[in-house]
Amino acid sequence: MSERTSADDGAIEAILDTLARTAPEIRAGLVGRREYVEAANPSGEDQLAADVHADQLLEDRLLAIGDVGTYVSEERPDTIEAEDGGDLSVAVDPLDGSSNIKPNNTMGTIVGVYDTPLPARGRDLVAGVYVLLGPITTIVAAVDGTVTEYVVDDGDRHTAREDVSLPDEPTVYGFGGRVPDWTAEFTEYAREIESDTSLKLRYGGAMIGDVNQVMTYGGVFAYPTLESAPEGKLRLQFEANPMGYIVESAGGKSSDGERSLLGVEPDDLHDRVPVYLGNAGLIDRLEAAVDGGK
């Protein structure tokens, strides 16, 4: 993981404050923006009006921070450069889980702060952040190997928990993708997890909410390799790297099935990757199960 400078410290604080101020606007903007627009993002997914609105807000606000030089979004094909920006690059999933807007379930924003041009490895992150729009709005930020949870109230952030770590005794799991599309190796692993009576299924259709369950209760989240998508479904720069950075900073592990997500070398801004996150023992078992099929 990248070493921070004193300039980075101030920039990260500014980014967190900006995300706190913007979160109420993103939440308020969901009302009346539940319909699809006639456009798709670079991954081929139909865009909701809420996706576009959140993306525009975040671009405007984050690029206004002097130390941020580049804005990259899951919703856009290319990077956006600030006219007089600094050396930090932000990679954003503006509204992770936006398909949950129709049933009014959890969603939020994922942000990776890199100190190098994108695409980049997760090892080049200086911060990983997610903003959870649940019954209350919270921010979970990993900075310099330490995870802090904030509660957002009227655009201000207040520390709720410091030195957040995954509980030693995991109790939840959540697996994405259609079950018939899982590989034989992952299916076997999933059946072992399901047979463990100490673990309960918690899957809500938004990575941000499902990983927050793991951060709160301990466990494992997976959006695995699929027969129809061997490269995985989640985006490395915008989702996998920041969330992997947070989970690892909280004492857990991340994996693409072979190695830490933070060590995956990207080829493109919108690369996809299998994602496995959680307590170390559960991820070790996953890697052993997946490797056994090779």
Where are the model-predicted features located?
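IMPase-like, lithium-sensitive Mg2+-dependent phosphomonoesterase catalytic core
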Residues: 2-30, 55-294
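N-terminal, Lys/Arg-enriched amphipathic/low-complexity engagement segments
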Residues: 29, 35-36, 41-62
